[in-house]
Amino acid sequence: MPSQRIECDVLVVGGGMAGATAALAAREGGARVVIARKAPGSTGLSGGAVSVAQDPGCMPDTPFAARAGVVESARRIAATRPGHPYRLLRDRLDRLWNAVEFATGQLSAVLAPPTGRNRWILTPFGHAHPAATCHRSMAGGDLAEVRGTLVVCGFEGHLGWDPGLVAAGAERVRPLGGPASRPILLDMFRWEEESLGRPFDLARRLEAPGAAEEAGRVLRRVLRRGDAAAVLPPVLGLDPDARVAERMAVEAGIPVAEFLSDLPSVPGLRLHRAVEARLAAAGVEVLQGEVRAGAGPDLPASVGGREVVARSWVLASGRFVGGGIERRGELREGVLGLPVLASEGPFADPSIRFAARPPASITLRDSRAPQPLLAAGLRVDDELHPLDAEGRVVHPRVFAAGAVVGGHDPASDGTGMGVAMFTGWLAGRSAAWRDA
């Protein structure tokens, strides 16, 4: 019978992008790493974009080619957002791209190589979204790169996606350097059991032998002269090895890509599975369950019936979706009970009892303004050590990464994946005694 006690170098709490990046960075440094998680995290809900930084200084009509690159955009965010993690880590922003390349390289089966500039990928709601990189199955739909007409596809009789709405997003950014576009409906999935099929069901059907090829032939029959690429709903397979987009493209004769996903998200599950596979291949042990009775490094913590003792901890447990921040009378970090603070705005003064205030009192009427509640989290120093209410380091071998770190709103400010990768990479290296 195996021992119930695990001794390791690094315990990572949380299994989303920040936690996985931290674990893989620590593992690369030779550390024995254990991940403890309650659930997969918000990474499995992602729509396919890896958002790192978009230029805060550009105007809406600034052409794609004139916008700042990803790292320069992060520097501009650091200069204008005093509570943002990029501002806190501004002296190390020259390593941001190392972190992004590391994380995307670890997940290269799913993620396209980053180029240094933002790609512009359509959303299902008719917007063009900037992303430092995206799924490989989406890269062919980069609005800044398509030369010719972009064919925006939906499925005849299926109510899940509106190609006219999606194509309208491409038309709006055409003056910025985007392509002409036109919507079409493909005669697929019309029989009763598939006309209301869930995205995951459609993705599995397209993986079947011959299915992607037939879909490519259906697409080819409706193409016109000048059509340069096609984007479809984000259902082009769950398994990257099925190569659904590539198989379709061979038959269609033009590049085939997906647009971004809403929930439920096939790309999110695809990315989650890639993370799982990479952690297993790297030798990271994953324990399912809450961390209980854990007081920090060198002390035993109970995780899913196992006792874990680690020299260093990385808190990468997320915020509200991931469960890293809880409200039990007041906002608290859920593992070590660390204080939750606002990082900017009227509640940034540590003397204000921010965490105990009613939620309605820590939101702002202006929806475009930074929201104190949605950006709440741990306050950290420039080494990513969590701080207590008096601004003191909680423990020199406890680090924080990802959404549990306050000062940014991953859902709205366009830096969620970037903060996760950057802080995860830095925290993982530091936890393994490989200072970045």
How should these model regions be labeled?
Residues 38-78, 191-203:
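Conserved N-terminal glycine-rich FAD pyrophosphate-binding loop of Rossmann-like flavoproteins
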Residues 85-151, 264-301:
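Feature captures the FAD/FMN-dependent oxidoreductase FAD-binding
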Residues 285-287, 309-316, 320-406:
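A glycine-rich dinucleotide-binding beta-alpha-beta segment and adjacent secondary-structure elements
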Residues 166-174, 209-231, 237-292:
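Helical element adjacent to the flavin cofactor pocket in flavoenzyme catalytic cores
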Residues 10-13, 34-36, 291-292, 307-320:
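Short hydrophobic core segments
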Residues 9-35, 424:
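N-terminal Rossmann-like FAD-binding beta1-loop-alpha1 element of flavoenzymes
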Residues 24, 47, 322-334, 395-396, ...:
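A conserved FAD-binding loop/helix module that cradles the flavin
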Residues 83-84, 140-160, 180-183, 192-201, ...:
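Helix-loop-beta segment of a Rossmann-like dinucleotide-binding subdomain
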